[in-house]
């Protein structure tokens, strides 16, 4: 998988998995889980670094934060 495809997958996982979970959790619990927020912040920090510096390590870090955010979403259900 190319770096661009990996980047697209991160955005897709955010839109299709993480964002819907956040909506569900906000409706159910009336709050935004800080652990998920911190992972999302880290995802987009690494993606912006990748766009500026082009380092694969930032894509890898964003992928790891994406997986942790997804796991945190399931933890809250």
In which residue ranges do the predicted regions lie?
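N-terminal extramembrane/targeting module of integral membrane proteins
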Residues: 1-77
């Amino acid at each position: 998988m190319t770096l661009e495809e990996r980047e697209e997958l991160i955005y897709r996982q955010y839109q299709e998995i993480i964002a819907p979970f956040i909506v569900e959790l906000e409706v159910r619990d009336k709050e935004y889980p800080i652990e998920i927020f911190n992972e999302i912040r880290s995802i987009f920090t690494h993606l912006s670094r990748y766009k500026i510096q082009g380092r694969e390590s930032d894509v890898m870090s964003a992928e790891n934060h994406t997986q942790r955010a997804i796991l945190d979403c399931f933890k809250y259900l």
